[in-house]
């Protein structure tokens, strides 16, 4: 009888204790690759083998080529060559993105929906799987240069504080059904490869002045009965150091931002469903800005990104861009406060989705200098993240200069 009671007790513990308490059995030890300094696939295989020996079991690799990204040296772009015009001066760019390189845009896999730079993905999958490494394709949505260049009419509309007018923006209008169909077609073709998953690029957001296309405003009016009029959204707009700021967002703005966050999640779901028509087992990860976890109200205002909305959709992983140096620069906090913030962020998102669905992304390159971050600093960041909970980790962006010995040690810990 005592043995029977013990068994029942154990079963109850297994099935009814909160999932977040338990460390997951198969942690993701990932690295994210923006560019590989390899001239051919033999060198690629050697590089991937080094990652394997460092304890890496998941490779997240860029499969898009935006206009100012660097080409993979082992790829063979079609002739005639793409434009080689230099990139424009940096204005901060997309946060965390390493810029530089030749012009031209497209993708690195076969599809009839986008220009193909070279079909290298199949070979990369083969090499990764031969080394027992899973591979996630890292792919864009709104910031897809190839579609923007082909269809300027697909550009979104934004509110220009300087002129007080709605003008054309720089990213795709996801409220245009044609844009969604093109993206769904690309992702379906991407899903035909033997990849293990897809990471959405961090462009699936709408900033506080974005989303004012005719289609978006019409849908918002239909869904809420409210007009998406910029004049009713912002109060006390002011200029400082050449930039415009908002002192106060109105109640209409918050309804607008909440609605935009739902539309973004709906767009992601449409794309995921299209890809899973081809491969039902395909995993999806969504990039989360650090504010989405640390300051949800700000993230909703600035990015229309809402973790509570996103967890209602079928994402397998939530990839938190916990880029400590970027956070320090933007927030003006001390190292100590940033480290404590990383622990709090980890603990906070564990409470929402559990440990196994979280991928905490650690910055290993300084975005401004392009230099590798010192080993002791990487270790300190990882230590404080792990204090928040036993979560999956990814180091971003890994290059030939990244200290793989340190990464191996951190994965083993």
Question: Which sequence ranges carry the predicted segments?
Answer:
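Substrate-binding cleft of secreted/luminal carbohydrate-active enzymes
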Residues: 307-413
């Amino acid at each position: 009888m005592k043995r029977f009671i013990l068994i029942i007790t154990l079963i109850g513990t297994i099935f009814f204790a909160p999932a977040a308490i338990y460390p997951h059995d198969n942690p993701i030890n990932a690295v994210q690759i923006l560019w590989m300094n390899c001239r051919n696939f033999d060198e690629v295989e050697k590089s991937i083998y080094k990652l394997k020996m460092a304890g890496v079991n998941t490779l997240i690799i860029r499969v898009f080529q935006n206009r100012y990204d660097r080409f993979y040296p082992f790829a063979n772009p079609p002739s005639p060559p793409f434009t080689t015009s230099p990139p424009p001066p940096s204005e901060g760019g997309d946060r965390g993105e390493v810029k530089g390189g030749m012009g031209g845009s497209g993708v690195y896999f076969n599809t009839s929906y986008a220009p193909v730079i070279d079909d290298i993905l199949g070979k990369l999958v083969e090499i990764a799987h031969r080394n027992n490494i899973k591979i996630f394709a890292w792919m864009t949505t709104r910031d897809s240069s190839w579609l923007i260049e082909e269809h300027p009419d697909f550009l979104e509309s934004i509110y220009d504080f300087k002129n007080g007018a709605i003008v054309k923006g720089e990213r795709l209008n996801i409220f245009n059904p044609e844009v969604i169909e093109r993206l769904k077609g690309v992702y379906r073709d991407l899903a035909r490869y033997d990849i293990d998953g897809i990471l959405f690029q961090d462009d699936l957001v709408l900033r506080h002045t974005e989303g004012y296309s005719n289609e978006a405003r019409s849908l918002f009016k239909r869904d809420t009965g409210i007009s998406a009029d910029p004049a009713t959204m912002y109060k006390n707009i002011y200029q400082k150091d050449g930039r415009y700021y908002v002192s106060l967002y109105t109640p209409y703005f918050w309804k607008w931002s909440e609605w935009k966050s739902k539309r973004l999640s709906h767009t992601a779901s449409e794309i995921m469903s299209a890809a899973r028509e081809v491969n039902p087992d395909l995993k999806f990860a969504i990039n989360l800005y650090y504010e989405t976890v640390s300051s949800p109200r700000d993230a909703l205002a600035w990015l229309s990104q809402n973790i509570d909305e996103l967890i209602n959709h079928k994402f397998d992983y939530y990839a938190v861009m916990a880029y400590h140096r970027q956070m320090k620069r933007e927030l003006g906090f001390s190292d100590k406060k940033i480290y404590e913030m990383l622990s709090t962020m980890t603990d906070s998102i564990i409470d929402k989705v559990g440990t196994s669905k979280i991928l905490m992304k650690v910055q290993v390159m300084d975005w401004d200098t392009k230099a590798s971050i010192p080993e002791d600093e990487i270790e300190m960041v990882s230590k404080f993240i792990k204090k928040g909970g036993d979560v999956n980790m990814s180091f971003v962006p890994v290059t030939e200069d990244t200290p793989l010995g340190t990464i191996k040690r951190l994965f083993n810990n």
